[in-house]
Amino acid sequence: MKVAVLGAKGRMGAEAVAAINAASDLTLSAALDLGDSLDQLVSSGTEIVVDFTTPDSVMKNLEFAIQNGIHVVVGTTGFDESKLNLLKSMLSKHPKVGALIAPNLA
């Protein structure tokens, strides 16, 4: 399975990159951070994205991933009820895409 990490230079992102690299059944498709293009998720064939970015950027990242059929795992803190409702709305338009919100993975 091809997995990408957003926020790859942060503490949790770096741990996720290391774990993916150590797993025999996962392939790191992209390790992106501030300033990197999300288009790399599509060009690398990413199937799942793990987001350890910031509350300010997570929704844009989720929208991009979901619109491109990429499943998401969110480890970003600050995911409130309004963001959850927006995520549900995005997912309702893309029923084959899944999302897991786990904001305290540290």
Predicted regions and their residues:
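Rossmann-fold NAD(P) dinucleotide-binding segment
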Residues: 42, 48, 52, 56-75
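Short, Asp-centered acidic motifs that coordinate Mg2+ and/or phosphate
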Residues: 30, 47-48
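Hydrophobic beta-strand scaffold residues
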Residues: 28, 72-73, 98-99
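Rossmann-fold NAD(P)-binding glycine/threonine-rich loop
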Residues: 63, 76-100
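Extreme N-terminal starter segment of soluble prokaryotic enzymes
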Residues: 1-4
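N-terminal Rossmann NAD(P)H-binding glycine-rich loop of SDR-like oxidoreductase domains
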Residues: 6-17
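NAD(P)-binding Rossmann-fold cofactor-contacting core
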Residues: 19-40
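Short, acidic/turn-prone active-site loops that include or flank metal/cofactor-
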Residues: 36, 77-80, 105
